[in-house]
Amino acid sequence: MKTIGNRYVVVDLEATSTGSKAKIIQVGIVVIEDGKIVDHYTTDVNPHEPLDAHIKELTGLTDQRLAQAPDFSQVARKIFDLVEDGIFVAHNVQFDANLLAENLFFEGYELRNPRVDTVELAQVFFPELEKYSLPILCQELGIPLKHAHTALSDAQATAELLLFLREKMAQLPKGLLERLLEMADALLYESYLVIEEIYRNQSILTSPDLVEVQGLYFKKTASPLETRKLSQDFSKNISLLNLEMREEQEHFAKEVGLLLKDEPVSLIQAPTGIGKTYGYLLPALSQVENRQIVLSVPTKILQNQIMEEEGKGLKEVFHTDIHSLKGPHNYLKLDAFYRSLQENDENRLFRRFKMQLLVWLTETETGDLDEIGQLYRYQHFLRDLRHDGNLSSKSLFVTEDFWKRSQERAQACKLLVTNHAYLVTRLEDNPEFVSDRLLIIDEVQKVLLALENLLQETYDIQSIIDLVDKALVGEENRIQQRILESIRFECLYLIEQFQSGKSRKNILDSLANLHQYFSELEVEGFEELVRYFTAEGDYWLEATETSQKKIQISSTKSGRILLSSLVPDSCQVLGVSATLEISQRVSLADLLGYSEAKFVKIEAHKKQDQEVVLVKDFPLVTETSIEVYAKEVADLLMDVQAFQQPILVLFTAKDMLLAVSDLLPVSHLAQYKNGAVHQLKKRFEKGEQQILLGAASFWEGVDFSSHPFVIQVVPRLPFQNPQEPLTKKINQELIQEGKNAFYDYQLPMAIIRLKQALGRSMRREHQRSLTLILDRRIVGKRYGKQIVASLSKEATVKTVSQSEVDETIDEFLNEL
């Protein structure tokens, strides 16, 4: 046998199934020597059994074609001769290698080649990607894949991927490759052989674009380019960005310009889909010369989106110095990561994650962990690696620290982009953060919730139990022991009561008991919990975002914080939204503490490309069990998916979303199941799945612009939960003022949320969408007329029976 060196044999098999009884139906082999493709081979194989319809559709193979193909025994020798002396490479190597080895074994050949998996190599060397299937990798890296699920085409693409990976490795410093090799036992197969080959031939010289500190390699920070002056003419700036200006956008930008000239505090309302972001940024950048502009958006998803889209355009065309600032926990703490590298961790997944981070450090300019594509897989390890906002003067990475760097960039840049949660937290600590600056708040109505969150505190109940258990071990005072035991009992009781859905009164009684016990507790280390449980305020239980089994206790202080109380007078404020008007008797400006703010409204025109369909005979959501209603929704989605159009389903509750997800028999994307919101958005936009089930920020914090047509489904009207702290407080305020909390606030807010939902899929001209509202209260309740009247101003509204839904969608799809 020849010496195994840098000869790679890339194999792809098509088979009758992916199970243990799979039979080979097609073989594709590509041979790489000295970094070049030198040979290829392909053959069909007769499985002597009919193919499933799914396999026929996937591969394009037919029973008739395979009936003419050779048996595996007739091609086994040729295949073995090709693969015998090489390193076996495949995408998901376990399937191909095991199936081929088994078939060769029955023909008298033993396949014992080392194995390389291009999936795990791609995960390490392309850490920013979210999916690692062969078609998606080819799409991301520009590798041709003409006939997916054809063995030779897939093998050719996998070979090109391997060559791409080798090139990527060759660009990395030798010291980094050495460190990766030291950790390569985290890889499942012999994939380290590829790294080892590149390492042997690698120069010891480090790339001039990288700097080495304590064995870590960082991308050198580029100096900002000299900013280009923007024109006072909005249309010229839009033209330079290679964009088409819309009439409504120009009108909006003109109004923004006037407000920035004359008004210290102003609010402007404009319809969705007109290009509001450029509409306020370009006038601001052209008019505000000697002040920094701070832009706050509702979510980190939108923050990232602006940096990737508008921010990228502003940097490229105008060299605008723009920076994105988030809370410290969003950044990698280098000291913590460095310490973790010194530890001999036995967890294979964590070691592989550390390999990813080592590569990522050579690429990132920000250290923002959101850049890592599959971050959700590593949440368990991130707790100790996230930045805590503190930096010791003795740190090994004082200069490179990402949080410190981000703070410095935030001070120096022209345009600072942040999110509402970080903005209000920072303002509470230091109002000077926006002194003498222009503060633009997009979706300004969402600041109300961010301000409410400042008043809230949350503790994980199991963490309290763990702390009590530790204290009980060393506590000698008998009375304090009893108090700790009582606290432990009440915590366990709360978990049991919440998970079983028992009486709310029992929970309130137990919370009252905890208040009493903590007021008597004098054990060291419990000071924060004593303060928390003895403070005045409302308390409630809820499951965490990540798990229904993890229960947390939350509280809110009485009263509300007004935005005006946090923002200094020297700061100019511009609030922007598609939905600022609440009702005739309730003003958002009043709720924010800016009753004197100038208000401008850009009237919305009725969109011809948008239709709202009300289903009048769907089961009544308030009188139907969650199981039955979820089944009805799932059945409707199965009918609608036959139109082969993207479907976005917007839920108001996590339990309903998960119930529908469990019942859907087709592959789909679901929030709380398939990764972070921004990852789901990207996967849906790329067409990876036809159906996306979303809640929370999908109503108003995520935009979909890539699909020319989207079907939206709203199973339930988005009324705010009257028990939510913010809603409860505002309701109480309005009642004290003699107003009707439902008609003056809750109903208008539901209409606002519906309109925001309609705007998710109307982000550009000629984009079309149809929204199905299944909650029949909209046609049966008195307040439904108010909702319909408001929606009718912006879109065509139809009322149909469930049996007419398919026909209605078909008609809309076929309209010019």
Residue ranges and their predicted role:
Residues 389-415, 420-518, 580-592, 723:
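Signature of the SF2 helicase/ATPase Hel1-core->accessory helical subdomain module
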Residues 87-94, 98-104, 133-195, 771-773:
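Acidic, Mg2+-coordinating catalytic module of metal-dependent nucleases/exonucleases
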Residues 390-411, 430, 516-624, 695:
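A contiguous, basic/glycine-rich beta-loop/short-helix subdomain that forms a polymer-engagement track
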Residues 261-282:
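Walker A/P-loop
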Residues 617-625, 676, 680-775:
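Conserved RecA-like P-loop NTPase helicase motor core
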Residues 2-114, 127, 131-145, 149:
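Conserved non-catalytic scaffold segment of RNase H-like nuclease domains
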